[in-house]
Amino acid sequence: MTPDDFRAWHDAMNYTYDTGAKALGVSRGTYADWLSGRSRTTGKPITISRLVALACAALAAGMGEWATAAH
């Protein structure tokens, strides 16, 4: 998932920085880094992991945490 993909997901979900960070279980700062594509502390490009991409896909599909998902 590229930062542009992440931004598109963020926009499609109508998340704010706070609601998106809470949904993914990360800090607001980490979420902001993913949206910008750069680390706010080093300025270096960041990589959004496959795990995060899969979590985004699950949330977009209306799925919650496994323990609360119908399975």
How would you label these PLM feature ranges?
Residues 1-2, 26-27, 59:
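Intrinsically disordered, low-complexity regions enriched in Ser/Pro/Gly/Gln/His and often acidic
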Residues 19-24:
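Short alpha-helical "recognition helix" segments of helix-turn-helix
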Residues 25-46:
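Recognition helix of helix-turn-helix/homeodomain-like DNA-binding domains
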Residues 44-67:
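DNA major-groove recognition helix of helix-turn-helix/homeodomain DNA-binding modules
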